[in-house]
């Protein structure tokens, strides 16, 4: 039996981007990929606009709770994806790290649900590419690996 690939999505608070990425991957890959999310400085709740923007796609993350990064999980997963510029993790031998410098519409004056939809769509495109890479046994995920 082949082991399922696994991914850990990390952002600072584990209330927005990493939760969105995990929700999108769960919907896209189903049980073909083990999906986890965590934060380097976890907040107390999922961002309401993040949940609303995924809800528009039929994905419910409102019951998720922010959790801290577990060093053992970082070592155990195949890929760690760091979303945004705030979260920092030291690379672990044997685990692939990817940095996703996600779109930040607020830098262009776009806020509220419109901002979150743009963030969601950027993350969704990246999640689709990662899901494709994880489902191809001979390929290795390779978007912006950390050296």
PLM ranges: what are they?
Residues 85-147:
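Phosphate-binding/catalytic loops
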Residues 1-71:
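Conserved active-site segments centered on acidic
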Residues 74-76:
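Alpha-helix C-terminal capping/helix-to-coil transition sites in glycosyltransferase folds
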């Amino acid at each position: 039996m082949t082991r399922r690939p696994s991914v850990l999505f990390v952002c600072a608070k584990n209330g927005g981007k990493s939760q969105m990425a995990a929700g999108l991957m769960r919907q896209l890959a189903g049980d073909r990929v083990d999906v986890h999310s965590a934060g380097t400085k976890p907040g107390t709740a999922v961002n309401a606009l993040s949940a609303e923007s995924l809800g528009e796609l039929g994905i419910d993350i409102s019951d998720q709770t922010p959790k801290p990064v577990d060093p053992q999980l970082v070592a155990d997963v195949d890929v760690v994806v760091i979303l945004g510029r705030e979260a920092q993790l030291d690379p672990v031998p044997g685990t692939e790290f990817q940095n996703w410098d996600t779109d930040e519409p607020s830098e262009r004056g776009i806020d509220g649900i419109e901002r979150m939809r743009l963030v969601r769509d950027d993350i969704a495109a990246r999640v689709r590419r990662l899901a494709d890479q994880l489902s191809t046994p001979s390929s290795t995920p390779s978007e912006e690996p950390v050296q």
